[in-house]
Amino acid sequence: MSVPCEVAVKCVLPVVRAMVAKELMANYGLRQVDAAHVLCVSQPAISLYSRNIRGKAIHLENDQQIQDLISSLAKSLAEGNTSRRNIVLTYCEICRTIRAKGLLCRLHKAFDPLVEIEKCELCVDSKSVRCV
């Protein structure tokens, strides 16, 4: 049995990091090595993100609410004016939003065939996604 947070760590977090990395480089002029430092990942990981080789398990670019959260996170990281706690909370907010919108369901089903997407309300129930 896999739980939604496990799927999020394996599939969603790399997508979010890829989106943030691209925004840091495109909008804030960071080089790959600088974006890697800010995101606490390796420069080769950033290279894979920028070439769409890693971080493509779920398509989030067309969701304006998620894109706004990503942009806010990228801005905070680029400016370096926010606490680690707030960065973590923003990551969690992005994940909760993705889960609440039902965007994780098909991935969860791929990890655990016993998940009944049509009946499951775990992620869309606002009380169940209070991880932080």
Question: What do the PLM-derived regions correspond to, one by one?
Answer:
Residues M1-R17:
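Short, Lys/Arg-enriched anionic-surface-contact patches
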Residues A57-A74:
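Short Lys/Arg-enriched helix C-cap and helix-to-coil transition segments
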Residues S72-V132:
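Helix-turn-helix/homeodomain-like alpha-helical modules used for DNA recognition
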